[in-house]
A protein has these predicted regions:
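The substrate-binding groove and active-site-proximal loops of carbohydrate-active enzymes
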Residues: 8-19, 58-80, 197-212, 229-238, ...
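Active-site-proximal helices and loops of the catalytic beta/alpha 8
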Residues: 2-4, 26-32, 36, 45, ...
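Active-site-adjacent "subsite" loops/lids of carbohydrate-active enzymes
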Residues: 182-225, 236
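Substrate-binding cleft of carbohydrate-active enzyme catalytic domains
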Residues: 75-109
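Core domains of carbohydrate- and sulfate-ester-processing enzymes
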Residues: 119-195
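Residues at alpha-helix caps and immediate loop-helix transition turns in enzyme cores, especially N-
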Residues: 20, 82, 243-244
Length: 497
């Protein structure tokens, strides 16, 4: 069986020219050949910003680029038919499709309602700082451009827990809506800001049974319409775990698919929170390993001062590898984004080796690391910046190595602050498999490592071409392997036939 590898096929600043669905359709065969087994596509539903929407400012779940709404028929990425054609092409190439689902909030309501709210302290949302009073909020959604096709469900204030704008006074604040489903916010895992149920826009009220049923009905429709194989669930930190337990169980039952699910619970450096969420969802979904990403970023910033023996300390992949999706970057951590924490370019080849060539975790590569990216935006300081993200050196070879070479027993040599390595013995199923990986964040390094007696007498070379040596494996399956300074080498049999 081939090792699984995900590609996130978008980034926040992908051009809004409607080309993405067409591009993945063209690229699918090449990506499958390279070694990718699943493609994570961006949110396909119409956002309130129309063609300018990256998909997370969700307006209409049933509009996949089909209806003239928010000043456009297509989304940023293309039309509904182009989306379905792209999914067909990905499937034809032998890969799976993971769709990005935003069920935390809705944006761009069609009509304002007069609703009763209490204002809360933004830093402690459990503290009410006003008596109940009326505001005007855009909480009515009836999707006039769709005219009831696929669903005639009308969303109103009873479908939401909170909003952040009073259209009457034009005041921006966080308002808890008084409805029939409790005195305040929904119960979520994180007590950051007192209660972090509210994130943005109109926050969906999953305590309302009509809302839960509509979201299940939509999930069925979406799966039947597109045939996706898995889901990436946005902002699960802000949604009660009980909702996704119910939703995922329902979806798997009615679709007869054990489809893959990964949640975005971004809590860098806070492994206990990730584990708490995994306990609450009882293993129904994987999570992105925000803790490992935190370590990779720190390693890239600290250079030789970072102790590489600690790279997997307090990470999800170390304690729950079967539910860990490992990443080097994503659309939230890229430069100028809300959770900006990019891994510096010099360290990225090492970071990708750490997620792609080891036995644990389900790695996910990021679009700009394969294709590069260039864009402009304002930073947190209000100034405009031009960003260039170069493609990562040797990333295609590293993905290919995961596909062809990184199999069999793993032996770790995480024993030096500036130079660590591991070996994979290889197996009979994958011809020519087996490797020795060595990386250094300081000077040139070397390490004696065992690749297994099955390789005795073979000559190993650096698959990445970063080190010129040729290494002979001794009768015990061992050899001394080398790596250049601030670099990674992947040693493989010269003759892998």
């Amino acid at each position: 069986m081939q090792n699984g590898t995900i590609l996130q096929f978008f980034h926040w600043y992908y051009p809004n020219d409607g080309s993405l669905w067409k591009k993945i359709k063209e690229e699918a065969p090449r990506l499958a050949q390279m070694g990718f087994t699943a493609i994570w596509l961006p949110p396909a539903c119409k956002g309130t910003n129309g063609t300018w929407s990256s998909g997370y400012d969700i307006y209409d779940l049933y509009d996949l680029g089909e209806f003239d709404q928010k000043n456009s028929v297509r989304t940023k990425y293309g039309t509904k038919q182009e989306y379905i054609d792209a999914i067909t092409a990905i499937h034809d190439a032998g890969m799976q499709v993971y769709v990005d689902i935003v069920l935390n909030h809705k944006a761009g309501g069609d009509e304002a309602e007069l609703i009763k709210v209490r204002k809360v302290d933004p830093e402690d949302r459990t503290k009410f700082i006003s008596e109940p009073y009326d505001i005007e909020a855009f909480t009515k959604f009836y999707f006039p451009g769709r005219k009831g096709k696929y669903s005639d469900f009308i969303w109103d204030f009873r479908c939401f827990t909170g909003v952040d704008f009073d259209n009457k006074t034009k005041e921006t604040a966080i308002y808890s809506i008084l409805n029939d489903y409790g005195e305040g916010w929904e119960d979520v895992i994180d007590d950051e800001k007192g209660n972090y149920d509210y994130l943005m826009y109109d926050d969906i009220e999953t305590r309302n049974p009509a809302v839960r049923e509509e979201l299940k009905k939509w999930g069925e429709w979406y799966c039947q319409t597109t045939g996706f194989d898995g889901v990436r669930l946005d902002a699960v930190k802000h949604i009660p775990p009980a909702f996704y337990n119910e939703w995922l169980d329902h979806m798997r039952q009615v679709t007869k698919k054990e489809f893959f699910a990964v949640g975005e619970y971004w809590a860098p450096g806070n492994l206990p929170l990730l584990l708490k969420y995994i306990d609450a969802t009882e293993g129904r979904m994987s999570l992105f390993d925000a803790s490992l990403h935190h370590n990779l970023e720190a390693a890239s910033k600290q250079g030789r001062d970072f102790d590489l023996t600690t790279i997997f300390n307090d990470t999800l992949v170390a304690v729950k590898p079967e539910l860990s999706v490992t990443v080097v970057g994503n659309h939230d951590t890229q430069p100028l984004q809300a959770l900006e924490a990019p891994v510096d370019p010099w360290f990225k080849p090492m970071a990708y080796a750490l997620i792609l060539l080891r036995e644990k975790g389900y790695p996910c590569a990021f679009y700009p690391d394969l294709y590069g990216a260039k864009y402009k935006d304002k930073g947190g300081d209000g100034n405009e910046y031009e960003i260039y993200m170069p493609g990562v050196e040797n990333i295609e070879k590293l993905v290919q190595a995961r596909k062809d070479i990184a199999y069999g027993t793993q032996r770790d040599y995480l024993d030096h602050a500036n130079c660590i390595g591991w070996t994979r013995e290889g197996d009979d199923e994958h011809k020519g498999s087996g490797c020795a990986v060595l990386l250094s964040n300081g000077d040139e390094g070397f390490k004696q490592m065992e690749v297994g007696k099955r390789h005795a007498g073979k000559t190993f070379i650096d698959y990445l071409g970063k080190h010129p040596a040729r290494v002979t494996i001794d009768a015990d399956g061992k050899a001394e392997f080398h790596v250049a300074g601030s670099s990674v080498s992947v040693w493989v049999a010269e003759d892998r036939g």
